[in-house]
């Protein structure tokens, strides 16, 4: 967890990529929102050829295949969705609907990313869910690291000669760092946009 734009999701995606390559398993990504349901995310009944059938969501597929899944924007969901992860996060790591039970493969991993509690629009994490997690706080990178990240974003986005003076880029980053707040959580994405 950490402030918006601190690099949590990209770090998690890189971690997932490395894990998937090392274990030869799939990597998944899902971004939570209030509109999602247990059926769309985990496991549930869906209409198929006029009948209700039990179908896996992305989380159940990942559990069965022993993959790693990044669940991004966890605090932009609703508490009821987060609580549905409790049985998956338990030692038994199981989910069920009706008579279908899915036990997680031994290589299954799940990583949640979320903004910290100061971010407006966050849903409060249910205590029973939060107690099942190990959390790491990601703050904004140093000014020098932010400069290097902006350089990389500009190089990848422009695909042309970068004509913006280094001194101007450093000024933009310092200004961004000076005005950054919970109300205005400016990040390297904003600085790169200013440079572009």
Question: What spans do the regions from the language model cover?
Answer:
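AAA+ P-loop NTPase catalytic core and its hallmark functional loops
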Residues: 1-170, 174-180
């Amino acid at each position: 967890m950490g402030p918006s734009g601190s690099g949590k999701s990209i770090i998690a995606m890189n971690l997932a990529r490395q894990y998937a390559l090392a274990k030869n398993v799939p990597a998944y990504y899902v971004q939570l929102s209030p509109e999602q349901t247990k059926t769309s995310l985990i496991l549930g009944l869906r209409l198929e050829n006029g009948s209700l059938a039990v179908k896996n969501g992305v989380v159940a597929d990942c559990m069965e295949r022993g993959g790693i899944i990044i669940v991004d924007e966890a605090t932009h969901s609703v508490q009821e969705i987060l609580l549905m992860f409790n049985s998956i996060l338990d030692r038994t790591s199981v989910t069920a609907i009706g008579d279908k039970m899915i036990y997680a493969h031994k290589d299954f991993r799940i990583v949640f990313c979320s903004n910290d509690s100061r971010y407006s629009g966050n849903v409060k994490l249910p205590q029973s869910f939060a107690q099942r997690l190990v959390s790491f706080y990601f703050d904004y990178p140093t000014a020098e690291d932010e400069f290097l990240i902006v350089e990389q974003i500009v190089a990848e986005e422009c695909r042309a000669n970068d004509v913006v003076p280094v001194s101007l880029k450093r000024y933009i980053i310092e200004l961004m760092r000076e005005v950054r707040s919970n109300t205005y959580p400016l990040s390297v994405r904003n600085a790169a946009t200013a440079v572009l």
